[in-house]
Amino acid sequence: MAIISQFFAPLPSLTGTLTLTGRSFLPLNLDTQFPKPRLSRDRAATLVLQSKGDDSVDASDRIISAVCYFYPFFDGIQYGKFIITQYQPFQILIQPLFPAIRAFKSFPFNGFLIFITLYFVVVRNPNFSRYVRFNTMQAIVLDVLLIFPDLLERSFNPRDGFGLDVVMSLDSTVFLFLLVSLIYGFSACLFGLTPRLPLVAEAADRQVL
């Protein structure tokens, strides 16, 4: 508990003469063979390659994208100080991450340095695929949004009463959103899917060319 407090989905044959109301029509022969459209080998190969390229994501891209979603969660772990200390399942869920969280929080500028690294080394680097750059940018935007609850807490810091209940509810909501975003983004990337977080995906799209 002391450690916790430090961080806070067979037709019949149709060949014959068709007669209708006494009028005879031309024989219908459905056995006629029509030529099938053919693609050149080069064109067919091009289509296959394009299909594979659109539907597959490299394993390295999946891992890099998945790991990026830990950044906003580690940076906002303090918003879980109320819910983690009150509910043991959250303690059990977060406990394996304590060493990484401790390392992240060990230096005051770690968050800023990681932000600069992810933005300029990954997002603005065309050598990375758009899949990696989009997911990285989505994690960055999610972290930037943490400024708003932080400013609210700094300007409104009640010690008890109704105000404290409001702050506890706000912090718990932010923490749960970060936790769900981590689980959703991490698992989707591992499966090669593209997670789109509410309030975040559109802004990330505009930043990734």
From Swiss-Prot:
Q: Which family does it belong to?
A: Belongs to the Tic20 family.
- Which Gene Ontology terms describe the biological processes this protein takes part in? protein transport
Summarize the protein's role.
May be involved in protein precursor import into chloroplasts. Not redundant with TIC20-I, TIC20-II or TIC20-IV.
What the record says about disrupting the gene is:
No visible phenotype.
Its gene name is: TIC20-V
Q: How does it assemble?
A: Part of the Tic complex.
Q: Which domain of life is it from?
A: Eukaryota
Q: Which InterPro entries match?
A: Tic20 (IPR005691)
Q: What residues does the transit peptide encompass? A: 1-49
How does this protein sit in the membrane? Multi-pass membrane protein
Keywords (alphabetical) are:
Chloroplast, Membrane, Plastid, Plastid inner membrane, Protein transport, Transit peptide, Transmembrane, Transmembrane helix, Transport
This protein is called what? Protein TIC 20-v, chloroplastic
Q: Give the tissue specificity.
A: Expressed in leaves, siliques and roots.
User: Where in or outside the cell is it found?
Assistant: Plastid, Chloroplast inner membrane
Q: Give TM regions.
A: 63-83, 103-123, 132-152, 173-193
Record's GO cellular component, any one? Answer: chloroplast
